[in-house]
Amino acid sequence: MTHPQTIALVESLDHEGRGVAHVDGKTLFIDGALPYEKVIYSSYRKKPSYENAQTSAVLKESFMRADPRCPHFGVCGGCSMQHVEFTAQVAIKQRVLEDNLKRIGKVKAERVLTPIAGPAWHYRHRARLSARMVAKKGGVLVGFHEKSSSYIAEMRECHILPKHISDLIMPLREMIATLSISQRMPQVEVAVGDKLDILVFRNMDDITDADFAILKAFSDKHGAAERPLQIWLQPKGPDTCYPIYPLDAPKLTYSMPEFAVEMPYYPTEFTQVNPQINAVMVARALKFLDPQPGERIADMFCGIGNFTLPIARSGAVVHGMEGSQPLVRRAVENATHNGLQDKVSYEMANLFDVTEESFAALGKFDKMLVDPPRDGAVQLLKAITEETAPQRIVYVSCNPSTLARDAGVLVHTKGYTLKAAGIINMFPHTAHVESVAWFEKTGPCKTRKEVEEIEALEAAEREAAKAARLAEENAEKARKAAELAEKAAAKEARRAHYFAEKARRDAEEAASDQ
């Protein structure tokens, strides 16, 4: 389908890395466009107040524009910002964080931190690749999904995966095609550890002896004695995965030498995808937390102990809480593995359902580290009272909008000051923003009545903004309806004029004939 093309001047980037422009009162989100560029765009989704569009041509380039390294960029959904110069990516993400803090949380950090950034390429040590037999493509495809699509990108290489893993994409495509269950193996999970690599194949049917021989040969060919390539199968959910070859491989681990910590983990368990940046992130978080011997510190959403164990190395006593029982078990094992079992304790808890009473029951914490998923930790932070408030909170975030919301709760209702905040470029060439923020208790908590008044005011502001948007949309609809009515009236006038003229000419011709 051919879409109409128009010119726009791009003003900024949104949180997904799309160019933002305004044309005829509408907000445009334009894939592939950068701030200060003049582009020809083609709209592919239209709503009353906004449109989604694709860049067709760049008439005036931004100083931020770079040539994408990957030949699949623009089709593959694995990256969205390879067309942006690397240092500009970092600056854009920092601006996204600051804008969210100001707009959503109505807060400003006393200090903006220098961004944490590392290697631009080959950083991703965990990935979930899709696999599918596609007859039209002549075989099996292995890779990330295409942008905004369920189709798998036809990939031959990937510049964000480690080079030796990228080199496996084509051999994987060829090998899977030879399996008896090639059409029943929809996913390959990749895990790159300190001493080995693991491929977890999601097998929806049992493999045959011949399939096992093929997988074994693949491991032998592409692994090495000093760095094995271990094959795992996953017949159902993530907890069902198990190794099949080689069985004498070392454990899958990542390390943080600065804290003398080694973390064993399963390939399907959550860990940070960028181990270099993870180590720097942990170091920065602990610098702000400043754990001291004898302090009691909480690690909320602790996972397998990524922050818990480095904190415990300081001599502090750490209590980790996590909503997944398998991750809690792994965290306990990792504490023992590192000889820190006497310094840490863990429990499973739903941290999205914390109350003032349940938080108080945990006892007083001197400090707290929070590392929630994208939904944030608003319920946990609302449960803090004057009696239970930690003196310091370090918040590690994977979503700047929920961090901003939660920062608003801490600053405006719990008596905290946002001392510092900055971004962590955990995912180069994507719009994903990780960040860290340091809060210090400097004032009293608001009373419950005061909090209710603040929440009521915020709710009223949201409703007013919603009503304003609705009124704007209705006004736009009315304007368009008026335009259509005007066009229809003009068309009808032209039609009436045509027939009137025709009738006049017919009458003149009839008179002339007489």
UniProtKB/Swiss-Prot annotation:
Residues annotated as catalytic: 398
Entry keyword annotation includes Iron-sulfur: yes
Entry binding sites for [4Fe-4S] cluster: 70, 76, 79, 158
Residues noted as binding S-adenosyl-L-methionine in the record, renumbered to the chain: 272, 301, 306, 322, 350, 371
InterPro entries from the UniProt entry: 23S_rRNA_MeTrfase_RlmD (IPR001566), MeTrfase_TrmA_AS (IPR030390), MeTrfase_TrmA_CS (IPR030391), NA-bd_OB-fold (IPR012340), SAM-dependent_MTases_sf (IPR029063), U5_MeTrfase_fam (IPR010280)
PROSITE patterns (UniProt xref): SAM_MT_RNA_M5U, TRMA_1, TRMA_2
EC id: 2.1.1.190
Listed GO MF terms: 4 iron, 4 sulfur cluster binding; iron ion binding; RNA binding; rRNA (uridine-C5-)-methyltransferase activity
Listed GO biological process terms: rRNA base methylation
EC main group: transferase
Keyword set, alphabetical order: 4Fe-4S, Iron, Iron-sulfur, Metal-binding, Methyltransferase, rRNA processing, S-adenosyl-L-methionine, Transferase
Catalytic reaction annotation: uridine(1939) in 23S rRNA + S-adenosyl-L-methionine = 5-methyluridine(1939) in 23S rRNA + S-adenosyl-L-homocysteine + H(+)
Metal-binding recorded as keyword: yes
Database matches in Gene3D superfamilies: 2.40.50.1070, Nucleic acid-binding proteins, Vaccinia Virus protein VP39
Family of this protein: Belongs to the class I-like SAM-binding methyltransferase superfamily. RNA M5U methyltransferase family. RlmD subfamily.
Biological role stated in the UniProt entry: Catalyzes the formation of 5-methyl-uridine at position 1939 (m5U1939) in 23S rRNA.
Name this polypeptide is given: 23S rRNA (uracil(1939)-C(5))-methyltransferase RlmD
Organism: Chromobacterium violaceum (strain ATCC 12472 / DSM 30191 / JCM 1249 / CCUG 213 / NBRC 12614 / NCIMB 9131 / NCTC 9757 / MK)
